Every structure is written in structure tokens, then in C-alpha cells.
Amino acid sequence: MEVVNALGRRKRAIARVFVSEGTGKITINKRDLAEYFPSTILQYVVKQPLNKLGAAEKYDIKVNLCGGGFTGQSQALRLAIARALIKMNAEDKAALRAEGFMTRDPRSVERKKPGQPKARRRFQFSKR
């Protein structure tokens, strides 16, 4: 039984995924998916690539998640799962790419600039 690993990132979140054949159990940092992500929306985001391929009950997934917030972590995990599924079966790549699961979202926080209170916000200007 082979174990396939993949990495996914989003904002400050990093997801390392280890996929093996099994019964559909997803374990995140030694906790169950429903325990780690109580929100059903985030659970749905994580399972999207599996549901698209109809592989929700085929694989056991172990995950190391660190950094970021809940939404960033769930999207990093979705990317990592999609990448791992392609390593398992390369023919699924077109279907996952069409749904946008293979694209790394490059948006992240813009840095704060000196002489300004935030990244884009300027200090209040006084004419007189």
C-alpha cells in the first residue's frame, strides 16, 4: 500500500498531506475533520476534490496543518489533496484543473510601508 504525499499553501497556511488507500478517514493534526473544522462549509471545501472525483470513500488522508486561519488552512488542504490525487492518478488532472482546484491562490497580505499607518492607508492630510 503506497503512501503519496503533497504540499499545499494559502496565505500563511501550509498543509502537508499523506494519502493512502483506505475507507475515507481524514485526520488533521491527530484530530478528526469534523473536530478540527466544526464549520460544514470548511469541511465541504476540504472534500471538494474528493467529491469531484467520487473518491471520498477510497482514501485515508493524514494531514499536518500549520499557520494561518481556518479558511486559509482549509483552502491549503484542498490544494494539497488535489495534488496528491493527481500523483495517484494523473488522468484526473484535467477534471480538477477545470474546477480550479490545481491553482495556488497567490493573494496574500500586502506589507505595511513606512510613513503610512497601513499598507495603502495614508495618514490624514491637512492643507493648512
From Swiss-Prot:
GO biological process, one term: translation
Region described as Disordered: spans on this chain: 105-128
Pfam families (UniProt xref): Ribosomal_S9
Top-level taxon of origin: Bacteria
Gene Ontology, cellular component aspect: cytosolic small ribosomal subunit
UniProt keywords, alphabetically: Ribonucleoprotein, Ribosomal protein
InterPro entries reported in the protein's UniProt record: Ribosomal_Su5_D2-typ_SF (IPR020568), Ribosomal_uS9 (IPR000754), Ribosomal_uS9_bac/plastid (IPR023035), Ribosomal_uS9_CS (IPR020574), Ribsml_uS5_D2-typ_fold_subgr (IPR014721)
Ranges annotated as biased composition (Basic residues): 114-128
GO function terms (MF aspect): RNA binding; structural constituent of ribosome
Database matches in HAMAP family: Ribosomal_uS9_B (MF_00532_B)
Protein name as annotated: Small ribosomal subunit protein uS9
